UniProtKB/Swiss-Prot annotation:
Cofactor(s) the protein requires to work: FAD
Source organism of this protein record: Prochlorococcus marinus (strain MIT 9313)
Pfam entry (one): MurB_C
NCBIfam families, sorted: murB (TIGR00179), PRK13905.1 (NF010480)
Reaction it catalyzes: UDP-N-acetyl-alpha-D-muramate + NADP(+) = UDP-N-acetyl-3-O-(1-carboxyvinyl)-alpha-D-glucosamine + NADPH + H(+)
Pathway where this protein functions: Cell wall biogenesis; peptidoglycan biosynthesis
Gene Ontology CC entries for this record: cytosol
Main location: cytoplasm
InterPro entries, A to Z: FAD-bd_PCMH (IPR016166), FAD-bd_PCMH-like_sf (IPR036318), FAD-bd_PCMH_sub1 (IPR016167), FAD-bd_PCMH_sub2 (IPR016169), MurB (IPR003170), MurB_C (IPR011601), MurB_C_sf (IPR036635), Oxid_FAD_bind_N (IPR006094)
PROSITE patterns from the UniProt entry: FAD_PCMH
FAD-binding PCMH-type domain: residues covered: 29-197
Protein name: UDP-N-acetylenolpyruvoylglucosamine reductase
Active-site residues (renumbered): 176, 227 (proton donor), 297
Length: 307
């Protein structure tokens, strides 16, 4: 196990902790321990931690808010970084420019924008994740997505380079995809250009309607990662799964939600292995019945190479 340099212990709050269970930091509530774990509360702390991992020649992973991750029960080697403390945002009601740190919850930003008459993020009110995660995954709902409104991101390279800016055009956005998923880059912050001058009451109403729709049509009462599979446009993954009668199907503590078939929920005592097995089962069944291979939205860490 690597040793901690004295410089890290001098900066309050950033000393990495050994063997921390990652189940407490994922929305599925599963996953083994991180070899080293830290939750930076500033960009400077994050840079220090990334530099330490690079010097130690260890893997370094950002787990964001853990809402779109499945982490193996055996845990993860190297340094795992939780971004939940890296919060903050600045909204300009006149220009529509919004700056937000990577750990800022995207639902909070959606609500704040609506309150000051900025249109563009109403769809994001029910997304269980952070600004950084939304930028990486091109998160979307209700007919909107991150790429529609994001102008640029500030990133660091895990090799120690940066920070530097990437424009929306440079991010190669597509449905639930971006360049950020392929590179060793960590999102520090994002800039959005929203549409100013709207009636805040109307935007608040739309935001509330979107939230109500999501909470009544999706299983918010149990731990999940949100939608498991990308929609194979123009088809819907949930409908393909439901057509096979898989709603309510269980493997250990993992269940295909009876409310929405594109959600796998932890009904209690689930393991990452249970959930991973369920993902594979659904892929096999759907391909056999419909001739369609479903590709997960969720990122699986610590597993063998998967589709």
């Amino acid at each position: 196990m690597p040793t901690l340099p004295g410089s890290l212990t001098l900066v309050k709050g950033i000393k990495p902790q050994p063997l921390v269970s990652l189940a407490n930091f994922t929305s599925w509530r599963v996953g083994g321990p991180a070899e080293w774990f830290a939750s930076p509360s500033s960009v400077e702390e994050l840079q220090t931690l990334i530099a330490w991992a690079y010097e130690q020649k260890m893997p370094c992973r950002v787990i964001g808010a853990g809402s779109n991750l499945l982490i193996n029960d055996t845990g993860l080697p190297g340094l795992s970084l939780c971004m939940r403390k890296l919060q903050g945002s600045d909204l300009d009601p006149k220009t529509g420019i919004v700056e937000a740190l990577a750990g800022e919850p995207i639902p909070n930003l959606s609500k704040r924008a609506a309150k000051v008459g900025l249109h563009g993020l109403e769809w994001a009110v029910g997304i269980p994740g952070t600004v950084g995660g939304a930028a990486v995954m091109n998160a979307g709902a209700q007919g909107g997505c991150t790429a529609d409104w994001l102008e640029s991101v500030q990133v660091l390279d895990l090799n120690g380079e940066g920070p530097f800016e990437l424009s929306r055009q440079e991010l190669d956005y597509a449905y639930r995809q971006s360049l950020l998923q392929e590179k060793t880059l960590v999102v520090l912050s994002a800039r959005f250009r929203l549409d100013p001058g709207h009636d805040h009451k109307e935007l608040n109403q739309i935001t509330q309607q979107n939230l109500t729709h999501r909470t009544t049509t999706q299983p918010y009462q149990l731990p999940s990662c949100g939608s498991v599979f990308r929609n194979p446009e123009p088809l819907k993954a949930g409908r393909l799964i439901e057509a096979l009668g898989l709603k309510g199907h269980r493997i250990g503590g993992a269940e295909v939600s009876p409310i929405h078939a594109n959600f796998i929920v932890n009904i209690g005592g689930a393991t990452a292995a249970d959930i991973n097995q369920m993902i594979t089962l659904i892929q096999q069944r759907v391909q056999m019945a419909h001739g369609v291979m479903l590709h997960p939205e969720v990122k699986r860490l610590g597993f063998e190479a998967t589709a």
